[in-house]
Amino acid sequence: MKEDDIEIIYKNLHLDFVNKYFKNEKQQQKIHKNHNEWYKIHISSFDYSIYVFEDEKNDFVAMASYEVLTDTAKVKIYLNKYFRNKGYSQKILSESIGKFLQDNKEVKYLQAYILEENIASKKIFENAGFNYNNEKEICNDGLEYQIFIKKLQ
């Protein structure tokens, strides 16, 4: 990922989410600013790996990110809405896990934080070997997420 990708990621992935869950315009502007700052810091961090996926026309398809926490990494995958329901998610998740683990052999567990309403995402992670053990967490955005875990060999 490079700095030029930051605004593309926001427009293609986060804007709809922000508009859905945060109705106040000042909140939306603050989230946009925080988004830009977060990515600028994290693209050069050793604790984060961010992968951007494009199609053959160089259109933005998806992003996968990994946050390393000792022997566990949090994984997030975001798919451009125009590429959903076309079979991309499973392939992107699998490919990004492979890339991530090549450089992070000390990681023993992967965690995915998924909104309860996001049935499609839950299926994708379950198909990739993640399990849900009734563990939930309220994250910094104030929303409650179900935690799916995959134990690695």
Predicted feature residues:
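Acyl-donor (CoA/ACP) binding surface of acyl/acetyltransferases
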Residues: 1-6, 11-15, 50-153
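Solvent-exposed, charged/polar functional surfaces in cytosolic regulatory/catalytic domains
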Residues: 37-38, 99
